[in-house]
Amino acid sequence: MNNFVRQSLEDFLNEIAKARKNFGYPVIVAFDRKTANNVLKQEFIERYTGELFLDPMNSEVDIESGVSYHQLSDFCLDQPRLTFENADLSDSKATLMMRTVRGKQLQLSQAVGSTRRQVTRLAKASPINGPSLVFDIELKNTRNAVSENGRVYFSYAAGTNYAFYGGTTQFELDKLGLHFKEYFEAYTVQPGQREIIEYTLGELANLADLILKPKDFKIRTHGAPGTRLRNQASFGDGAVVLFVELEGFDSSNAIPPDRNDKLPYLLPDGYSANVLINSDFITKNLIIKQLKESASGISLLDWAPLLTGGLGYRATGELSIDGFEFYDNAGPNVTTFTKYNATYTCPPNMTQPKILE
C-alpha cells in the first residue's frame, strides 16, 4: 500500500480478516481529526451561552528580568484544534492549537540602570493575523475516564511544549508559551473553574438499560498515512482511537498496541469513524443471551473456545426457522434466491455442538 494513501474499504476488510485486531478489548472506536474538531468547535460555540469560556488575558510576561517584557492586553483565544503530525500509538501525542483573535501585544525594553521602559514593538491581533498558541497533549497521560455521563475529555493545563508564536526568538516563544500554561493552571485551583479548560472529544453512553456499558478505556492517537509530510494534503490527519472496556467482558489482559504497524489505520478512504466489536462479546452477550430469553426451545448447556477462534456451544431442544431467504451468486449476472424452512432438533438424550462465530 502507498504510505501516503488510505486503504480502500475492501483492502481494509481483507487486512483485518487475516487476524484479530481487538487486543483483548470488546470495543475499539476510532474517529478522525475533522470529526473531533467539529465537536470541539460546536462545544466552543455552546460555551458562550453557559459562560464557560476563558476570560480575556491581561498580563505581563517577564522575558528577561529587568530588561525585556511583553504585555498582553485583552487577549482572546478561539476554539481548540487537534492535529496528529506527531501522533504514534507508542506515545499517543496530539497537537493542540488555538489562534489569537483579539488583543494587543506590546514588547518593552528597559536599559540597565534605567527606570523607564521603551516600546520596541506593538502588534494587534485579529482573526486574520493573530499568533497561535501550540502545545502537545499526551492523551494517554491526560486526565481521562468514562465519567457518569460517558464523557471523554482533556485539559488545557495538562499539556507540554507550550509555544506562543507572538515572539521573535525561540526563547520568547517558549517563555510566552509557559506563561499560557501557568494561566491555564490557575483555573484548576479556582472553585468551579476547572471545566472552563476541559473540552470533550466524545461521549460513551453508560446507561443502565444498554448492553454495551463502558466501564473504562484507554485513549490513543494514530497518525494517518502521510500525516508528517507538510507538502501532503494529509499533513496533520489522524484518528483518536478508544480501546473500551465493557461491563460483562474480561479485559484484564487487554493492552493497546504499542507500535503503529500492529494496528492498521482504522479509517479507510472516505470514512470518518469506525467501531470494531469483539465477536466473542457479540456471541455471549447478544446472540446467546437472546436465544436463552427466546421461546425457541433451545437449551444451551455450556461453551468453550474453538481452535478456529469461534465459540462452541452444546445445546438440546428444537429450533425452527421459517421463511428465511438467502441468495447465492451463481455466476456473472446470475443470482439465485431460495426460500428456506428448516427445523433443527437436538434429541433430549444427547447433545451436539453448534458453532457460533
Where are these regions (language model features)?
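Hydrophobic membrane/lipid-contacting segments
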Residues: N2-E182, A186, Q190, R194-E357
